[in-house]
């Protein structure tokens, strides 16, 4: 309990310090605890420290945790398999990893009307600096249009999975397009508010690049 409590306190202070440096409103930053491969006991400790948003990568692993802690916010941040879409749609509040229209339609189909709309993010993969912005943004626009048309999905923004970079400057260079994509979408969908970007290894670069949601695992559970 003490380690997780200490880790969360230290992490929040780090976020505050970075936010002051870049003049970011900390109220707009969401901390998501990545709980894949973490025990129920570890999750319980984090909840007792005030953490109420958790991210899972694997559908099967997530189910016992969600059933046990059904009063907190669960985010699906893993790859979506078509045969698991119904489980994601029925059990999570957020899905970060929509990459195509087929997946969006399936999630919409299986989302119960008795639940609030499923908050959704369009996943963007930034691998290098040779991407074709015009081609990519057109694909993203078409996917956003599809999501926006579906009754049971709520488009909230984008999620980025950049290629891992070692240095801060390399991270900044890799992430520079991400908020550009978000800004382009926001011109049409003014209500979107989320850029899911950043892990334990790149918090400063992520916040500098406009992240509003940090996906943190090891800095909470391992240190």
Curated annotation (Swiss-Prot):
Keywords: Pyridoxal phosphate. One of its GO terms (molecular function) is pyridoxal phosphate binding. It comes from the Bacteria. This is Pyridoxal phosphate homeostasis protein. Belongs to the pyridoxal phosphate-binding protein YggS/PROSC family. Monomer. Disulfide bonds: none annotated. The modification N6-(pyridoxal phosphate)lysine is found at residue 36.
